[in-house]
Regions:
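Signature of N-terminal electron-transfer/Fe-S-associated modules in redox systems
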Residues: 1-173
């Protein structure tokens, strides 16, 4: 008789803890499951987009333990104990009000079709969490791994820079 081994992992996603059984049995998470599939398919967080599935486009970017990561390249079982924030986790959970960076993208048309936008915003948010006043060059460099097929890179950068200026003004008051 084959003895099954099941590992239990815990993720904290958008402030909420989740446990998953990793194994080969029915209802268990396969060891090969990537974080993007766990977030989208198991947790219903469809703001995380699956683009290239090779870590090249940035559409699946989330913040894990304070750093932007491409969730299509992370095995979920390797994320045990991690704190993860998705695009859904930036908005106020009680009211649904967008955070300032998300609102800046709306106000300054930092998107076109919107498919890449969550990954771009998450990458920018991770940068701003580390450096609240980056230069435009630093913003462009941070976003260089996020691709937009519609060509809205310039409006994405403009949106981030507008948000930074807004934050500077609010700090002066």
């Amino acid at each position: 008789m084959k003895v099954r081994s099941v590992k239990v992992i815990t993720l904290k996603v958008n402030g909420r803890s989740y446990e998953f059984d990793v194994g080969e049995g029915r209802g268990e998470m396969p060891e090969s499951e990537t974080l993007v599939h766990t977030l989208r398919d198991r947790l219903g967080l469809t703001g995380v987009k699956l683009g290239c599935d090779q870590g090249a486009c940035g559409a699946c970017t989330v913040i894990m333990n304070g750093k932007p990561v491409t969730s299509c390249m992370m095995l979920t079982m390797d994320c045990d104990g991690a704190e993860i924030t998705t695009i859904e986790g930036l908005a106020d959970a009680a009211t649904g009000k967008l955070n300032g960076l998300q609102q800046a993208f709306l106000d300054h048309c930092g998107y076109q079709c919107g498919f890449c936008t969550p990954g771009i915003i998450m990458t920018a948010q991770a940068l701003l969490d580390k450096n609240p006043c980056p230069t435009e060059t630093e913003v462009r460099e941070a976003l260089s791994g996020n691709y937009c097929r519609c060509g809205t890179h310039y409006t994405a950068v403009e949106s981030v820079m507008a948000y930074i200026e807004q934050m500077k003004e609010e700090r002066k008051q």
